Amino acid sequence: TDTKVWGFQLGGTSAVTEKISAGARASFYDWDNVSADPDFADDSERFGNLPTAFEKDARIGESTVFAKWSGIERWPAVVFGTVAYNFTADSGFVNGARVDPDQFAWGYGVEVGDAKQLFLLGIVYSHIPANSVLALYTDSDMFDGYTNREGFGIYVARELAANTEFKLSFWEGEPIKTTASGDGDGPYNPTEYESAAHKANRKRPQADVNFKF
């Protein structure tokens, strides 16, 4: 059958004090028959996912928590953390090497300011193991859609007009695992794939104009 995906999400925000609020979000995604289309989900190690990431289906949970301080009108501050877990990933052998499930991802960050008032400044850190999420469906800005990577990003944003935002970012990432054990090059960052984004450290400045509808 064709690949399908369904999901649900629940979240909310509550005032803790007059100037502090907190919130949380929980999501669950079920990818049915994800292995039916290699263009939809690739577990060949080329983009980070290993053959142990999923067999037929993929079930991934995600949760984010945050707290916001609004003590200064033009300089609110938000701290946040997020986790993701692939319930279908497993340990096993890939290319003759023993591999862990590599199924738990996490990240955190802080934002200060308001793009509509003066500007927004943010910094984030993410740790995305090989099988924690579906490669190519993860953060494309930070890691180009690859898994088995960790790194940070810093960005500044300013609203130019209603629903139009200019954003400057700098992203730096590197592989989490680079084992060369087993037959050939092992399961992580195999050299037969000539992808600099997958194998090498990445340092990338980026400029975006975002339109909101």
Model-derived features: positions:
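Active-site-proximal acidic segments at structured loop/helix or strand boundaries
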Residues: V34
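Outer-membrane beta-barrel pore domains
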Residues: E18-G23, F28, P38-F213
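Short, solvent-exposed loop/turn segments at secondary-structure junctions
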Residues: W31
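Internal, well-ordered domain-core segments that constitute the primary functional module
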Residues: T1-G7
